[in-house]
């Protein structure tokens, strides 16, 4: 079930939206034209969840709320208590990045938001979006250099395995290069996927290209440093989904 309702009178213009998924529902409400607040509720069963959602929607309509659509630029933000959740993700993100084990994990470091770097980037990105939409490539550089104090080291075209391994093992300010490389790539993945999760879009095809390159380098580093015996299935899934998103949404 999903319903979006709007109430207007001479003094106010408010929206209220509810959506169910399994035994959870999300309520998103506030002044129309803003992103409002998000709250997730959980029930013992899908039936109990659906029943309560229907009851709440009916009560709103009795108060004068009527069916309406959200503005096209409506943004989606996670509920702090529940964390990553499809119900607080943009419909476009849910369509193209559907694997919950890959896109909603908070502990798997191969996923977009499961590493500390990825989680911190998403948190900063949500704060940025609440103020004004950031330019994603500028935002990534700001997080890495401004918030973390690291050098910004994007993947290099045609870099050999030997060159990448040497870069990863070279020490800089007491840390091996791999620390900076992974920080860059995890921030890039989280920022690009996070922008789609929040707003349903990125700035350009170049953002998707950067995210795919970041995922590829994370995978290469893991094998070059013998952290993994084979390419990552998770990272392959992310690259595949990013490619499909770019192709089907007609990014330029």
Task: Give the ranges of each region predicted by the language model.
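A charge-rich, low-complexity, intrinsically flexible signal that marks solvent-exposed coils, linkers
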Residues: 10-12
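Short, hydrophobic/aromatic-rich segments at coil-to-beta transitions
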Residues: 1-6
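Eukaryote-biased recognition of C-terminal alpha-helical segments
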Residues: 214-252
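Short aromatic-glycine-(Arg/Gly/Cys) micro-motifs in beta-strand/loop hairpins
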Residues: 14-39, 106
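N-terminal leader/targeting peptides and immediately adjacent processing regions
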Residues: 73-126
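Amphipathic alpha-helical elements of HEAT/ARM-like alpha-solenoid repeat scaffolds that form extended
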Residues: 180-200, 239
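A short, charged, amphipathic alpha-helix used as a generic interaction element across diverse proteins
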Residues: 44-62
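Intrinsically disordered, low-complexity charged/polar segments
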Residues: 63-75
